[in-house]
């Protein structure tokens, strides 16, 4: 799954809320908050600088804590799917269930049935709406793994019917 401008479009209020929900508090949270409160930027073209303008969205580029802060933010997707009781694939019978893979701004949902995948997509849509994240549908793909053979027309039709509502 591909998010449209994931690093550049995160609202700071949602970012700080996610950091706080992950248990960051005290002086460290205050430091992060101060980095994003009334963040100002300007544009340099050749040797000229624009006027400063407020930037209410995006993680700070080049900041050493930005990848960690973004990871805390994107982890909200996994937590939401877990909290809604969605199911993934069993790795160890009855012990380990895997339903989402996260790496930076890349997300892979894992399900054993098309219906299960649709349920995860529905949950993810609710969470993305809440976090104000936009999925790039044109860059998002479905991949099916199965034991042998090609997908039947029926199975292929089911996979094509999956929708980002």
Question: Language-model features: where?
Answer:
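Nucleotidyl polymerases of mobile genetic elements and RNA viruses
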Residues: 1-165
